[in-house]
Amino acid sequence: QLLLEGRDVIGPYPGGRFRDVDVAYEQTAAGSKVLATHLGGFIPEVDRFDASFFGISPREAAFIDPQQRLLLEVGWNALEDAGQVREDYDRSRTGVFTGLWTTDYENHILGQPKDPEFYLLTGCGRSTACGRLSFTFGFEGPSVSVDTACSSSMVAIHLACHSLRRDECGMALASGA
């Protein structure tokens, strides 16, 4: 949609977005600190997530990385846009290939004063993101998380195409966050 509208969504850091802004600074050769970047792509209201729609308790949802929340929402939208209904894909050989890289939310949770809960493992683990999609949508094909830094989404798409060509799955959902 952004490409179609020609919109630029890169902007300055929103107030209160970083608990410790020092992580955004780098040391110069002279020993002074400079902000590595003044801009970023930030999703407004990233904490707004209809957990109950996906059968997730509010307690568990608090520990789910926004990347996983968005993958669920966008995955659902992609299936709807493709005209797929639950009966068509539930228990199907659908593969999920997800490109993920950062652990910012996990670092944020671990920096909180109270002890994290068990849900941190499933909510912030990059390896569990594709499994969450497969489980939620009832897919029974390959479920692969990909971490190749900046190329993760592209590699996820490549692996999805490869899996389709090899008949390892009948349909594939490729995503990246």
Predicted feature residues:
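Cys-dependent condensing catalytic cores that perform Claisen condensation/acyl-transfer
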Residues: Q1-A177
